[in-house]
Amino acid sequence: MLEQLPYLALKTPPKTTALLKAECADFIVKEHLGYEMSGDGEFVALYVRKTDCNTLFVGEKLAKFAGVSERNMGYAGLKDRRAVTEQWFCLQMPGMETPDFSQFELDGVEILTVTRHNRKIRTGSLEGNYFDILLRGAEESDELKVRLDFVANFGFPNYFTEQRFGREGHNLTQALRWAQGEIKVKDRKKRSFYLSAARSEIFNLVVAARIAKGATNQVLPNDIVQLAGSHSWFKADEKEDLTVLQVRLENQDILLTAPLIGEDILAASDIENEIVNQHSAFDSLMKQERMKAVRRPLLMKAKGFSWAFEPEGLRLKFYLPAGSYATALVRELVNYTEE
């Protein structure tokens, strides 16, 4: 699936091999919500460090310890299990004392902060994540250094990676069967997973087509472009001067986007329209399920991107906004194998 997608850096697969997540400590993620806890309110907020632990499993254990329903537990995003991750959880406990979480015990879990907050921490309510990744066995080479410089300066394809599609692409396979009327899907969680996989596939294919045509840094007629630093976007139609927009793109004032298909999707560039039309079953499914079309940047540039070669391999440190995948960046640098 992902292995079929083209590369942006050097237009070829990386020559360097590396192990990813050989140890949990090789993949460190720290969540950034973008706001501070209020210090009071009906929600107990917990900042937790997890090692080799599933987000939902830990959340359920915290809720059970506090004596509240799992429905009253919240978090901003699911984190990788095979990793060391830090993230916030909240428990709705109006009029109740904060439990003594110093008595909470769970292998691989350390509660770093306990406070209060005045609203629920909801899925998606985060700005991004800080990453500290060790690529074991990655040796210094001219080719790898060129790739590192490229990613630092120009970014990487903002692909959705394997975890979006389920084990061996199961979610995408089921989405196609659903779209073709072969199955019915009643479970709400499965419906969400399958719809996300289908939209992600179309997005990836549009990005891949732009790379194949050498159009990742070129504003095409009818492109949908996004203002940098916001989610506002507009169409590069006949009312817009493409020459002016091209300068704005090169100055990183605007970003090219690709679609997460759904209702009210706009006709865009010919490249994009061709891909969407080739997958009309998915397009129809999104409209049937009343999914609203949204835009996502075609490329992503990591903030604070730095690297260092160590005896064990290559260490990367960077920040990505919510929704972008660290593994999409890593695949531009090395041919990695996950342990």
Curated annotation (Swiss-Prot):
A Pfam cross-reference name: TruD
Does this entry carry the keyword tRNA processing?
yes
InterPro entries documented for this protein: PsdUridine_synth_cat_dom_sf, PsdUridine_synth_TruD, PsdUridine_synth_TruD_CS, PsdUridine_synth_TruD_insert, TruD_catalytic, TruD_insert_sf, TruD_pseudoU_synthase
Every copy of the TRUD domain together lies at 155-311
**SUPFAM superfamilies attached here?**
Pseudouridine synthase
Q: Can the keyword tRNA processing be found in this entry's annotation?
A: yes
Instruction: Please provide, in alphabetical order, the Gene Ontology terms of the cellular component aspect for this entry.
Output: cytosol
Q: Which reaction does it catalyse?
A: uridine(13) in tRNA = pseudouridine(13) in tRNA
Set out the biological process GO terms recorded for this chain's protein. tRNA pseudouridine synthesis
Q: What Gene Ontology terms describe what this protein does at the molecular function level? A: RNA binding; tRNA pseudouridine(13) synthase activity
The similarity comment for this entry is: Belongs to the pseudouridine synthase TruD family.
Q: What is this protein called?
A: tRNA pseudouridine synthase D
Q: Which organism is it from?
A: Haemophilus influenzae (strain 86-028NP)
The gene name on file is: truD
